[in-house]
Design a protein with these regions (language model features):
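N-terminal amphipathic/basic-hydrophobic helices that include classical n-h-c signal peptides
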Residues: 1-21
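N-terminal low-complexity, intrinsically disordered segments
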Residues: 20-85
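Polar/charged low-complexity regulatory segments
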Residues: 35-37, 146-149, 153-157
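Intrinsically disordered or highly flexible coil/loop and linker segments, enriched in small
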Residues: 59-63, 95, 99, 116, ...
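Polybasic, Ser/Thr-rich amphipathic helices
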Residues: 165-176
Length: 176
């Protein structure tokens, strides 16, 4: 087996860059895209909001509990936003090491698809937060917007956790 392929994402694109560990998304992928007219931080807003939801739902990794305890506390107190946590604690790279096992399983269901491309999260983010904005990148990094997308993420998470949604098609006869 070789080095795994990094699954970096941005809406509408797939990047296959070699890396030592799996990345789900990186803000720097979007620095030379339509996000250019905005400050660079805007490229990490969508990642930070998802990561904040994961932390606030106890899905952060032991790595962050050990190495980012102060930042985790500030995020939980809403002294910083998810994007600010992402920039400071993750060096603008959302990877497997950021979440615990359950968090990574959910990411692989919702944030990325089976091919390692953008998952349903991106459609939810656009529908909930960016539908009336000039672009995906114009979403303001604030707790009001976080609350809106957090409700959508939580719904998807509960659907994913439900035994019925995890049932295989050949198990159609099972009631739960």
């Amino acid at each position: 087996a070789g080095i795994p392929v990094q699954r970096g994402l941005r809406p509408g694109a797939h990047h296959g860059i070699i890396a030592a560990d799996m990345s789900y998304d990186r803000a720097d992928f979007d620095y030379s895209t339509e996000a250019d007219p905005l400050p660079k931080g805007h490229a990490g807003t969508h990642i930070g909001m998802f990561l904040a939801w994961a932390v606030l739902n106890g899905l952060e990794s032991d790595h962050h509990r050990a190495h980012s305890a102060g930042l985790l506390a500030r995020l939980r107190q809403r002294e910083i936003t998810g994007r600010q946590f992402f920039e400071a604690a993750c060096q603008e790279r959302f990877a497997e090491k950021d979440l615990n096992e359950e968090g990574n399983q959910f990411v692989q269901h919702y944030y990325v698809d089976e091919a390692g491309r953008r998952g349903a999260y991106f459609a939810d983010y656009k529908k909930v937060l960016a539908a009336r904005l000039p672009s995906f990148w114009h979403v303001a990094d604030n707790w009001e917007n976080y609350e809106k997308i957090a409700a959508a993420i939580s719904r998807r998470y509960e659907e994913w956790k439900s035994p019925r949604s995890r049932k295989r098609s050949w198990q159609f006869w099972r009631s739960n």
